[in-house]
């Protein structure tokens, strides 16, 4: 008789916190297209070396990192303005990432508390979610990058700690489970003492996924029972 495969033991959790870009909505490829176009104009390549640094950051921090890393001959403000103008024209087309809808509806069915914590600022968030307002109405609350309490972007802890304390009742941060696709987001969650499930882009270096509690190729692969949550049923 074959030996049973050991099941990983993770801490049971109650509230769940989700990132948005590249995890719930497929926006990362849209960002890549825009920044590639701008950087190519200056003879620079927007590749995964720089992309992995900016994933999860606030918009101005992203622009600053790209300008400095690639030594672009424009200011961070100029890059931000042009990229935002181009993004506003395409972000409304973003669809769901695999498994996102099913997982959120499963959590809602079982009346589990879950929220969204995204570095996106208000106007950008509204554009991204304009075709999915009913879906995002399922979340207990949403914390955005321009929230007054979010002083420091990821990998700073502000956004996840702010999001956690807005549950009712507020949980101990260690009882939260975060879902992320970016190294910056994973680092922020770990600094908060939270467990974090990472669903990285296939092109992201495996070295940048090692800090995550659990790494999955898709939200379809998430097994809630590993964290003490109700399992999916056929």
From Swiss-Prot:
<protein>
    <recommendedName>
        <fullName>Pseudouridine-5'-phosphatase</fullName>
        <ecNumber>3.1.3.96</ecNumber>
    </recommendedName>
</protein>
<dbReference type="InterPro" id="IPR045228">
    <property type="entry name" value="Gpp1/Gpp2-like"/>
</dbReference>
<dbReference type="GO" id="GO:1990738">
    <property type="term" value="F:pseudouridine 5'-phosphatase activity"/>
</dbReference>
<dbReference type="GO" id="GO:0046872">
    <property type="term" value="F:metal ion binding"/>
</dbReference>
<dbReference type="GO" id="GO:0009117">
    <property type="term" value="P:nucleotide metabolic process"/>
</dbReference>
<comment type="function">
    <text>Dephosphorylates pseudouridine 5'-phosphate, a potential intermediate in rRNA degradation. Pseudouridine is then excreted intact in urine.</text>
</comment>
<keyword id="KW-0546">Nucleotide metabolism</keyword>
<dbReference type="InterPro" id="IPR036412">
    <property type="entry name" value="HAD-like_sf"/>
</dbReference>
<keyword id="KW-0479">Metal-binding</keyword>
<feature type="binding site">
    <location>
        <position position="19"/>
    </location>
    <ligand>
        <name>Mg(2+)</name>
    </ligand>
</feature>
<dbReference type="InterPro" id="IPR023214">
    <property type="entry name" value="HAD_sf"/>
</dbReference>
<dbReference type="InterPro" id="IPR041492">
    <property type="entry name" value="HAD_2"/>
</dbReference>
<dbReference type="Pfam" id="PF13419">
    <property type="entry name" value="HAD_2"/>
</dbReference>
<dbReference type="InterPro" id="IPR006439">
    <property type="entry name" value="HAD-SF_hydro_IA"/>
</dbReference>
<keyword id="KW-0460">Magnesium</keyword>
<comment type="similarity">
    <text>Belongs to the HAD-like hydrolase superfamily. CbbY/CbbZ/Gph/YieH family.</text>
</comment>
<feature type="active site" description="Proton donor">
    <location>
        <position position="21"/>
    </location>
</feature>
<keyword id="KW-0378">Hydrolase</keyword>
<dbReference type="InterPro" id="IPR023198">
    <property type="entry name" value="PGP-like_dom2"/>
</dbReference>
<feature type="binding site">
    <location>
        <position position="21"/>
    </location>
    <ligand>
        <name>Mg(2+)</name>
    </ligand>
</feature>
<feature type="active site" description="Nucleophile">
    <location>
        <position position="19"/>
    </location>
</feature>
């Amino acid at each position: 008789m074959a030996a049973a495969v050991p099941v990983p033991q993770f801490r049971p959790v109650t509230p769940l916190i989700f990132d948005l870009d590249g995890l719930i909505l497929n926006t990362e490829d849209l960002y890549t297209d825009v920044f590639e176009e701008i950087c190519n104009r200056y003879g620079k390549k927007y590749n995964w070396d720089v992309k992995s640094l900016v994933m999860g950051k606030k918009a101005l921090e992203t622009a600053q990192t790209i300008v400095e890393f690639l030594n672009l001959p424009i200011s961070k403000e100029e890059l931000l303005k042009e990229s935002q103008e181009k993004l506003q024209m395409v972000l409304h087309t973003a669809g769901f990432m695999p498994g996102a809808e099913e997982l959120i509806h499963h959590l809602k069915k079982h009346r589990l508390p879950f929220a969204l914590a995204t570095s996106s600022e208000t106007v950008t968030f509204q554009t991204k979610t304009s075709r999915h307002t009913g879906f995002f109405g399922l979340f207990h609350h949403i914390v955005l990058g321009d929230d007054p309490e979010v002083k420091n972007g990821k990998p700073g802890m502000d956004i996840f700690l702010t999001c956690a304390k807005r549950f009712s009742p507020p949980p101990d941060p260690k009882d939260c489970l975060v879902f992320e696709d970016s190294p910056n987001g994973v680092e922020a969650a770990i600094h908060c003492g939270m467990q974090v499930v990472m669903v990285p882009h296939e092109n992201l270096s495996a070295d940048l996924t090692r800090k995550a509690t659990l790494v999955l190729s898709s939200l379809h692969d998430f097994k809630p029972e590993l964290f003490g949550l109700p399992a999916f049923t056929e």
